[in-house]
Structure formats: C-alpha cells, structure tokens
C-alpha cells in the first residue's frame, strides 16, 4: 500500500515537472512558433530569463535618454566680462571723444568753462554712441539671468535663519530682484534715449536708474547682514560684503555731490560746476559697475550650462549635484 502511494506521488511529481518544462519551452520558443518547440527537448530557465530581461531593456531604452550637456561656461568668467564691458567702453568713449570731439562734448547751455564732459555727452556723439549702445546690449543680456541666479542663491540661504524671519526675508529677496530688473531696464533706456534726442525722458529714466541702483545696493547689504548673521564666512565672502559697503558709501556721497553741483550749474551757471557734476557722475557709474563686479566673490567656481534630456532625468541628475551653501 505504501509503495503504491509513493509511486503515485512520484508519478504526480514527474507529471508536474513535465508540465512546467513544457510551459517553459513554449515561452522560450515564442509560444510554439516552431514545429517541435513544445514537444520534447530541454530548455534552460536562466537563458529564458536572460532573453526576457533583454527584451524589456530594449523596450525601455528609447525612453531612458541620457542627459547631454551642450554648453558649459564658467560663470566667473561670464560675470567678469559682463561687468568690465561697460567700464572699458566708457573709458574708450571718454578718451576718443575728449581727443577728437572736444568742442562737441564740452558744450553746455550756460556756455561756461568746462573741462570734464558728462557720460551723456561722450556717449551721445557719433561714432561713440554706437559703440556704447552695442556694449550695453551685450552687457544687459547676461544681467537678466544673473539677477535670477542671485534670487535663487539667496533663497537657498533661507535655511540659515529662523522660521520667523523667512517671510520678510523672502519679500526682501523679491524686492532685490525687482529693483535689479528695473535698474537694468533703466540702463537700457538711458542708453538708447540720449539727452540730445529727448532730454526730459532721458532725465527721468536717469533718476529712476539712480534711485533703483542705490536702493538695490542698500537692500543687498541688508539681506547679506540677515543671512550671514552668526555664520562663519569665507575670506571671499567677507571681501564681497566689505566692498559692497564701501561702494555703496561712495555712491551715496557721490550722489550728494552730483545733486549739489547740478543745482549750481543749472540755476547759477558757475564755472566748473558741470565738470564737478560729471566727475561725481563717473564715480557713481564706476561704483555701480564695481558693486556688480563683486559677484566674482559670491560665485567663484560655479558654471552655467545648457542641458538636454527628459525632465525627470534632468531633475534626478541635478538632485545629485552639490547645492550652493
């Protein structure tokens, strides 16, 4: 009786193994596509699994595109070129206009003695005006993305401060972005609408530029004080904050001097009053350029790149990159 039961069990087991082997051969041969694919012979389960995995990988391959970097530029070098371009152009316009067009750039409505032409004068004559406008066009292009880079950089620093300070600090970051964008737009306006073409509009745009520039400097210094309070800063960060404060002080003092001598020239026509006005105007312009030049200490080793790839792959790629501190 026991032998009969054992034989039956063995027969059932053999039958089950045979059925499993048959199904495996059918799957491995593509569901019975060949003449003997399901009728005898042996099939290797490892080979079957390898074949199925290979087919699945082939099906996924078109969807899993790799992230490709098409352009990679040093953010440091980009900022250096952007900041120095108007400074070099301004110097070139000053020298060439002073040497070759002396009478044109020194003419004023008071007809008084003058030795230093204003920025509007040296960039309003031809061909300097075209050179200046071309350089400002190249300068403004990178300024817009740099403004948003600063916004994202400041937002990444919000974790340093207490939660109670975050809402007001976020508003300050947004204010800095708006002031920066208005300053950039005003720079374009005061460049392309010269005082000789439309003096009232040129004057109002210049005032807008001055106000936004000073407010931007002050707000940036205030924000750095909030974000860096109680933090251990690097030498470059300390240098950046130090020069921002110095250049803001120079801008404030120069603005006071500019207003005083503008009034003396406009209402009293004093000799050399316009020259002093122009002198302080140059100081303001140079201080503004150098203030933005401090970005080389804020972003000493970052890069700007153009990347191609699916959004999910790009997000995963960027999530593995080190974040800004």
From Swiss-Prot:
Keyword Transmembrane: yes
A Gene Ontology biological process term: GPI anchor biosynthetic process
Compartments, as annotated in UniProt: Membrane
Main subcellular location of this protein, as a coarse class: membrane
Gene Ontology cellular component annotations, sorted alphabetically: endoplasmic reticulum membrane; Golgi membrane
Keyword vocabulary terms for this entry: Membrane, Transmembrane, Transmembrane helix
Bilayer topology: Multi-pass membrane protein
InterPro entries named in the record: Frag1/DRAM/Sfk1, PGAP2
Membrane spanning stretches: 80-100, 130-150, 171-191, 205-225, 243-263, 276-296
PANTHER family from the UniProt entry: FGF RECEPTOR ACTIVATING PROTEIN 1, POST-GPI ATTACHMENT TO PROTEINS FACTOR 2-LIKE
Family named by the database record: Belongs to the PGAP2 family.
Name the UniProt record assigns to this protein: Post-GPI attachment to proteins factor 2-like
